[in-house]
Design a protein with these regions (language model features):
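Negatively charged, flexible loop motifs adjacent to catalytic sites
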Residues: 40, 62, 82-86
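Alpha4 helix (beta4-alpha4-beta5 surface) of REC/receiver domains from two-component response regulators
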Residues: 80-99
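Acidic, metal-coordinating helix/loop segments flanking the phosphotransfer/catalytic sites
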Residues: 34-52, 60
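C-terminal output helix
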Residues: 86-87, 104-113
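Short amphipathic alpha-helix used as the core "switch/output" element in two-component signaling
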Residues: 42, 61-74
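CheY-like receiver
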Residues: 120-144
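Two-component/phosphorelay signaling modules centered on CheY-like receiver
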Residues: 15-33
Length: 144
């Protein structure tokens, strides 16, 4: 059986962030692609099925595109410069549990990615031992 590629789709306006995430995720064994908006994922459904999405978008954009994104909530990481209790609550109600404070710490990203469950036929990144817990939320410098 042919092994499917692990895709990581990156949505961020900051070119430096995109370049950094590309480099980090390629090191972790992902094929990466930068996207400008969620509509680009519509054409790539099969790749998204076996991958994950990292995005820095406003909550309003997430709510608008939620019907489309709902099926990937378990492999969606929201990156944001400001993590508040209100934001965390709104995202949890939507089914999004992975929130990372920007700038993204590569070691924390590795922990978060390690906890993602990829579908059958998609080889998950091999990072060694699996950590505890299933979801990470970074608030300030701490992981909650």
């Amino acid at each position: 059986m042919k092994e499917k590629l692990k895709w990581a789709f990156i949505l961020d306006k900051d070119e430096f962030v995109r370049l950094s995430l590309n480099k980090i995720l390629k090191k972790y064994g992902f094929q990466t692609e930068e996207i400008e908006d969620f509509s680009q994922l519509e054409k790539r459904k099969k790749d998204v099925e076996g991958g994950m999405i990292l995005a820095d978008v406003e909550i309003d954009v997430l709510e608008k595109d939620f019907a489309f994104l709902k099926r990937w909530c378990d492999r969606f990481i929201l990156m944001t410069p400001l993590v508040s209790d209100e934001l965390t609550l709104r995202l949890k109600k939507m089914g999004i549990h992975r929130i990372m404070k920007k700038p993204v710490d590569p070691r924390l990203l590795r922990k978060v990615v390690r906890e993602i469950s990829f579908p059958n036929g998609v080889k998950a990144p091999s990072f060694g031992k699996k950590g505890e817990g299933s979801h990470f939320i970074q608030k300030g410098g701490e992981v909650v």
